[in-house]
Amino acid sequence: MRRSILVLVTLAFLASVFAMPQFSAAPNGIGEVANTPGCFCHGLTPSDDTKVTVSGLPEQFNASETYSFTVTIQNDVMALDGDGVVTDGSRTVPYGGFRIFVASGGATISGVDATLVQELEGGLSHTVDGNKFRSWDFEFTAPADDTKTVELVVYGNAVNGNSGAGGGTSGDYWNKVEISIPGINAGSTGPSASALVIFITAVGLAVGLIFVGILWVFYRRSPETFTMAKFWSFLKPWLTTTDHKEVGVMYFLFGFFFFLVGGLLALLFRVQLALPENDFLTYDEYNSFFTLHGTTMIFLGAMPMIAGFMNYVLPLQIGAKDLAFPRINAMGLWLLVFSAPLIFSGIWSGQGADITWVMYPPYSSLSEANLGESLSGYGANLGTISFISGMAMLGASSTLSGVNFITTVFTMRAPGVSWMRMPLFTWSVFISVFMLYMSLPALVIGVFFLLFDHTLGTHFFVAGGDPLLFQHLFWFFGHPEVYVVIVPAFGIVSEVLATSARRSIFGYKSMVFAMAGIGVVGFIVWGHHMLTSGMDPFWRAAFMITTMLVAIPTGAKIFNWLATLWGGSLVMKTHTLWSLGFLVTFTLGGISGMFFPVAGLDIHFHDSYFVVAHFHYVFIGGTVFALFSGLYYWYPKVTGRKLNETLGLWHFLIGFSAYNAAFWPMHALGIMGMPRRTHTYTIESGFAEYNMAVSIFAFIFGLSQLLLVWNIIYSGKRGEPIGKDPWGGWSLEWSTTSPPPTPSFHDIPTQEDMNALYGHHSEAPTLKEKLWKGEPKEATS
């Protein structure tokens, strides 16, 4: 009877999903939006036949003065269709369009006729009625500071008027003009470096200071006998090592450094967004900053830090002396190290990559190779080629790591470390690298096709190719990539909470199957990133259902962690606090994520700040918080000393509070309609107060990481010395010295069942007793 009811409920749910009102898919976008004539049909390259004329603007502006100007589009070559001979303004089909915005300088522009002009993503564009003209009137209000120079960018397109039912036209040619208007007191300025060059110089200076610091520490050991030859003999073993522990330390330090670099990038564009109509960064600088921020935090920050834990801890947990292929492991590290300069090197040209971390074509494919020399300026920035090359090298590094860890777990487990007695962190790494290894080919193929388009002039993703193909390739990798970084975080939290609760993890087998389930389902949900790109309703419903299924294994893990805490005796340490913080923030991020599989809601949330809030709650509140927890937990094993608990407590209290205060308001911004990846916004939008709050708390969260940096440095020298096992852990890494020797085990250990050997918490009350009886079971005499 119960089974029949369950079947009926399931069928009713599926029927309701398929019956849900859906937006109609169009080949080029979302139904009614895409079918607005003349709005989405622009070609990939500008046309010299289209002339964009701007008249009425002053050569120099007076502070706060308002000027009237006109934008006119002309194309004498284009043959008009339909009612194209009708007097301008009374036609019923598209005739022309524009896009105008202030790139820098802080001026404002507005349309004279509100029926013809609308605000669009920080600038102005035409309405449907405005699409019937080729001339529009505007007002330019100068900034209050007449020492500035205002930069205007005006796009104009001429349309021949033959749009059909599907939208668009067969004749649509555009061009653009860029205009500089200095204030009357702007004067001439000396040469100055761009914000990007200043930033990368600061990063290089930081690297230099780190090197000088290492040199100083070595010098202080013995000033009388110091020579550079001896310093090199100290440094060389680290640069040429194949020991999994030293490679792991370098992975983590590399990732932590770029985690700070990526955070600094975020703070710089939070300054830009703190105030409406701000010009702290230009459009191009902003685009490059958030491109490098996303790429740095994910590929150069989070993944290397996770790889550091993988390299150091996994062989110790399974009782292996090293990884299966130590030289390949070291090679993967150095491929990662040399990919970073490639990703950032475009900054020295003054044009860092501006294609975002998702690298969507056709813009990312456009270059001199397929546009020609005269039009090459309309393609992606010069730094894009080196950026894409760096991404390809990252793919090679990750592939080598995947092979290594999979082979190690299969072949090098110590006696007693059976599949169902492996630590959950080892399981999480195994599942994570399997997902990485299976998903990487799609990314590597897409990246190389993108590189060929950009350098050889091929047409995989530009005219004659299919830009949506890249989206499929990227997200087939990109969504499993989310789980590649979060599943090891699950493993870290499982280790920390079980040890802190003084009991084994509740529901061990279900935790293993839940992580494996996430690993499988993670490959069949990528389409939810593309619900607004045009998709068959059947596949849209299928991706909606599979995305919702992810909540089942994830929810099982949350309840198992809570049951572990309930059934244990919790000891509150800094690593425990960060894991508890993970439970709160990751759960909130998961709840906000359940809005996106609903296609009707995704229309409104897609590319809004609601997505930014969700992603950061999962990525920082999930992955980074777990990494902090793992750092406080395993730091004693690496150094033989504990991190300072007082500094750790302040790090948690300030960081956790500021993090939530910074990212929670982003949900409200998304609901209000603020688009992501926007350079600025108007005062009238109502976004200013939330953005100011977000920026302030983002700075507090960023500055709180300096407590962690100081704690790592201070505790390495003056931290409390510890023995093998300061926390009471049970897995094999706690059976060797702190730090472990090289090789990690002189004799391969045998893992025993601690519950069977020591009656592990045999007298502790069971979960059932706590829930229903309220009293522990009576001790037997």
Spans of features found by a protein language model:
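Sequence context surrounding c-type heme c attachment/ligation sites in exported
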Residues: 2-6, 14-139, 148-204
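Hydrophobic alpha-helical membrane-insertion segments, chiefly the h-region
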Residues: 15-19, 210-215
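Core hydrophobic alpha-helical transmembrane segments of single-pass membrane proteins
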Residues: 202-212
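Ser/Thr/Pro-rich, low-complexity mucin-like regions
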Residues: 134, 139-170, 398-414, 710-722
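Short, solvent-exposed linear motifs at loop/edge-of-secondary-structure regions
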Residues: 65, 139-146, 556, 560, ...
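Membrane-embedded and interfacial regions of multi-pass energy-transducing membrane proteins
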Residues: 188-204, 217-781
